[in-house]
């Protein structure tokens, strides 16, 4: 089998729920990341060709049945680049990378692009239809399930609680981890460690706001304190 090399990697800045990137769907953001990667590596200008794209996501794009295909069509890549979509919940993006590596290892591809995209700001709900004839029953959101039985129907938040209980991880330890994570992220941002990996996203101007170039992580809370964390509900 052939060896696989990761040549480069980029991303957009992390947004927050209902924040600056709320108008962009996951395919919009993923296409911008792909174009940024192509510009950074100058792959196409050097005569290179991307064989395929593996894209992962825990949520599905509300505007497409084939988000990986739509992403490629929105990018600089051509129609002849095949795509595949991977859904493995929180492991979707890393699984997409594994699939891309496997394709290169076995010789079905030479150059692949792989990664993940998500937009919680554009998360949609599925609604039920009227199921009782002759009754006007308003559509209701259908709860999304991850398991066929209640004990399997748990998301990552519930899983984290279960693991904390299983291994005796205390609330104090969780707060310390969260605090250190925020401080390290803020310090890394201030020192410019993420600058080369973040692809700017241009947010168009409106009647009330000017054009904005979004090129940093929005979720950071550098003013986080241990006292503030300890006051949050468990």
PLM features: residue spans?
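N-terminal extracellular/periplasmic Venus flytrap/periplasmic-binding protein-like
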Residues: 11-12, 23-32, 43, 173-234
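Flexible glycine-/small-residue-enriched beta->alpha junction loops
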Residues: 111-163
């Amino acid at each position: 089998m052939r060896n696989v090399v990761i040549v480069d990697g980029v991303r957009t800045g992390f947004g927050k729920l209902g924040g600056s990137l709320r108008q962009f769907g996951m395919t919009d953001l993923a296409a911008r990341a792909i174009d940024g990667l192509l510009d950074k590596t100058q792959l196409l200008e050097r005569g290179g060709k991307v064989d395929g794209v593996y894209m992962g996501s825990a949520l599905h794009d509300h505007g497409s049945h084939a988000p990986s295909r739509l992403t490629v069509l929105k990018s600089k890549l051509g129609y002849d680049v095949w795509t595949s979509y991977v859904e493995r919940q929180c492991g979707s993006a890393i699984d997409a990378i594994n699939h891309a590596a496997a394709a290169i290892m076995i010789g079905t591809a030479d150059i692949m692009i792989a990664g993940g995209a998500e937009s919680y700001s554009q998360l949609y709900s599925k609604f039920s239809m009227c199921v009782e004839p002759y009754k006007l029953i308003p559509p209701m959101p259908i709860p999304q399930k991850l398991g066929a039985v209640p004990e399997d129907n748990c998301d990552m938040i519930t899983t984290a609680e279960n693991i904390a209980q299983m291994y005796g991880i205390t609330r104090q330890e969780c707060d310390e981890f969260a605090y250190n994570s925020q401080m390290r992220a803020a310090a890394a941002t201030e020192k410019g460690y993420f600058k080369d990996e973040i692809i700017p996203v241009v947010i168009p101007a409106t009647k009330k706001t000017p054009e904005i170039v979004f090129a940093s992580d929005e979720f950071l809370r550098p003013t986080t304190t241990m006292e503030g964390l300890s006051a949050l509900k468990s």
